[in-house]
């Protein structure tokens, strides 16, 4: 497990790059499970970015990554952005990996990002609770076991209004039976 300071340093560098380029982004994945559910170990940082703006700014993105101590493979990143597939960056100083998703898994999720204090005095855009739950449901449908527990914890700590929105989104995604199945599972013993 990496110290909090490593996450903060790496995120600070990455968010500065996205902000300088005008690329909308938000945190997602295991880190948001910690924010919305309960603490669990995570080894990387997951970030969803606006594909269109990133594609337009790709050469500038590469230059900024070079100056901020990130290890990356330009042809792989270019291909991933074209295909809207995940690519990775490695912070050479902190040895922390960033998984960058140049597409929204849930349509419109970047428009619903929430500013949350992720570190003391540092607010960052984070996937909304409802979209986080819906994304976990999509990952479960693709075989992610870890997302099952995350989804239950996010749902359990949601307001009734958010639970209704999660149910509605699951219905839209044609994953309502899977949501019911996951919510009906017993909690694992720690």
Q: Where are the predicted features?
A:
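Compositionally biased terminal segments of proteins
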Residues: 1-190
């Amino acid at each position: 497990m990496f110290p909090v300071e490593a996450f903060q340093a790496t995120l600070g560098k990455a968010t500065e790059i996205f902000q300088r380029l005008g690329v909308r982004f938000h945190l997602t994945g295991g880190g948001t499970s910690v924010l919305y559910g309960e603490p669990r170990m995570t080894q990387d940082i997951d970030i969803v970015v606006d594909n269109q703006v990133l594609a337009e700014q790709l050469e500038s993105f590469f230059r900024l990554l070079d100056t901020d101590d990130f290890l990356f493979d330009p042809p792989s990143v270019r291909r991933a952005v074209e295909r809207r597939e995940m690519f990775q960056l490695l912070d050479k100083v902190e040895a922390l990996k960033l998984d960058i998703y140049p597409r929204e898994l849930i349509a419109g999720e970047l428009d619903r990002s929430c500013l949350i204090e992720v570190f003391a005095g540092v607010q960052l855009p984070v996937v909304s609770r409802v979209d986080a739950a819906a994304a976990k449901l999509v990952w479960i449908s693709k075989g992610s076991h870890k997302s099952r527990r995350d989804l239950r914890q996010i749902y359990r700590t949601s307001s009734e209004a958010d639970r209704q929105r999660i149910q509605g989104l699951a219905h839209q995604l044609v994953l309502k039976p899977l949501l019911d199945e996951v919510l009906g599972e017993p909690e694992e013993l720690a």
